[in-house]
C-alpha cells in the first residue's frame, strides 16, 4: 500500500559543528491522510561499521496526532556518548540515521556519512592515541543521502504487504553480469590477467567504496525486513517554502499529546515544545 507520509526535506542545521555540539535537524514532511496515532522519530549514531552493538539512540520524539497537510519541526539531540564508541572509530567516518515509525512499524530510514576530524593541522598530522574530543569537528555529508523504505500497515484493514522487487532498481550480482560464451580457455586467460592486475594494484584503496560499504552495513543492520532500497529525489532535494500560517502538530519526547493541544511547529525545537 502507498505510504501516507512523505519526507519532503531534512536540513542539517549548524553544519559543520564541533563534535560535542547538539545535532539539529529541520524536518519537513507531508501527510496525505489524517493519522490518529503518533509518528515516532529516532536519531541514531552508528558508533562502528562492524557491529550494531555500538549504535546509540541519541533521542526520540513523538509527533501527533497529525492532520492532513505539510508540517515542519526542528529535532535536536545530544552528541553521542564517547565512552560507548570504540577508540579507533571516534576519528574518521561514521553514520547518522534518522528513522521514523508508525504504530511501532519503521517505514523509512535515512542515512548520512559523518566526518569527524581535528580542527588543528598538527593534530591531523599527528593524532593522539587517545582522541581529544574537544578538538574534534563534525560534518554531516548532506550531499550523500541514502534512503531505505519499508511497506507497513497504516490501518488495521491494510493487508500485510510482501516486498516486490523492482527490476528497474535491482542490483545484480557480479555473476549475473558475466557474458555467456563457449570460449572457456579465453575466459581463463582473461581471468588470470585480471588477477595479475588486481595484485599489481592491491595497495590502492577506493575510499568512496569503503565508505559506501560502511553505510550499507549500517542501513542493512538497522532492520532485516527484506525491503527494497530506493531514493526519493523529491524528498531529499526539493526546496520547500513554508507558510507562516500552516497547521502544526504537537511534539513530545515522553508522552503523547492530544490533537486539540497541537501548536504550530515553525521555529521551535522538540525540547521547546514539551510542556
Curated annotation (Swiss-Prot):
Sequence ranges of Acidic residues compositional bias: 157-166, 183-207, 230-247
Cell inner membrane found in the keyword field: no
GO biological process, one term: egg-laying behavior
Tagged with keyword Glycoprotein: no
One GO location term (cellular component): chromatin
Location in the cell: Nucleus
Top-rank lineage group of the source organism: Eukaryota
Molecular function GO terms recorded: histone binding
Annotated segments matching region Disordered: 157-275
Keywords attached to this entry: Chaperone, Chromatin regulator, Nucleus, Transcription, Transcription regulation
Composition bias type Basic and acidic residues, residue spans: 265-275
InterPro entries assigned: ASF1-like, ASF1-like_sf, Hist_deposition_Asf1
Role, per record: Histone chaperone that facilitates histone deposition and histone exchange and removal during nucleosome assembly and disassembly.
Record's subunit section: Interacts with histone H3 and histone H4.
Alphabetized PANTHER family for the sequence: ANTI-SILENCING PROTEIN 1, HISTONE CHAPERONE ASF1
Record family assignment: Belongs to the ASF1 family.
Protein name: Probable histone chaperone asf-1
Amino acid at each position: 500500500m502507498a505510504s501516507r507520509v512523505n519526507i519532503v526535506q531534512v536540513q542539517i542545521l549548524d553544519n559543520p559543528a564541533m563534535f560535542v555540539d547538539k545535532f539539529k535537524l529541520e524536518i519537513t514532511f507531508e501527510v496525505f491522510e489524517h493519522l490518529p496515532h503518533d509518528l515516532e522519530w529516532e536519531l541514531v549514531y552508528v558508533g562502528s561499521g562492524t557491529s550494531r552493538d555500538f549504535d546509540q539512540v541519541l533521542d526520540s520524539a513523538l509527533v501527533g496526532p497529525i492532520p492532513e497537510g505539510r508540517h515542519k519541526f526542528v529535532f535536536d539531540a545530544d552528541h553521542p556518548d564517547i565512552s560507548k564508541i570504540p577508540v579507533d572509530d571516534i576519528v574518521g567516518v561514521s553514520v547518522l540515521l534518522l528513522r521514523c515509525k508508525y504504530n511501532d512499524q519503521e517505514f523509512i530510514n535515512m542515512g548520512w556519512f559523518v566526518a569527524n576530524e581535528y580542527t588543528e593541522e598538527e593534530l591531523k598530522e599527528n593524532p593522539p592515541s587517545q582522541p581529544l574530543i574537544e578538538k574534534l569537528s563534525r560534518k554531516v555529508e548532506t550531499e550523500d543521502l541514502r534512503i531505505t523504505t519499508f511497506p507497513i500497515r497504516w490501518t488495521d484493514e491494510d493487508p500485510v504487504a510482501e516486498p516486490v522487487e523492482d527490476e528497474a532498481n535491482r542490483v545484480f550480482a557480479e555473476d549475473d553480469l558475466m557474458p555467456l560464451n563457449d570460449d572457456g580457455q579465453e575466459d581463463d586467460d582473461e581471468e588470470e590477467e585480471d588477477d595479475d592486475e588486481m595484485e599489481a594494484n592491491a595497495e590502492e584503496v577506493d575510499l568512496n567504496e569503503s565508505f559506501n560499504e560502511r553505510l550499507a552495513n549500517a542501513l542493512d543492520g538497522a532492520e532485516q525486513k527484506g525491503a527494497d532500497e530506493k531514493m526519493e529525489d523529491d524528498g531529499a532535494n526539493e526546496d520547500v517554502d513554508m507558510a507562516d500560517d500552516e497547521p502544526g502538530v504537537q511534539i513530545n519526547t515522553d508522552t503523547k499529546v492530544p490533537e486539540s493541544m497541537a501548536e504550530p511547529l515553525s521555529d521551535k525545537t522538540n525540547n521547546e515544545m514539551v510542556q
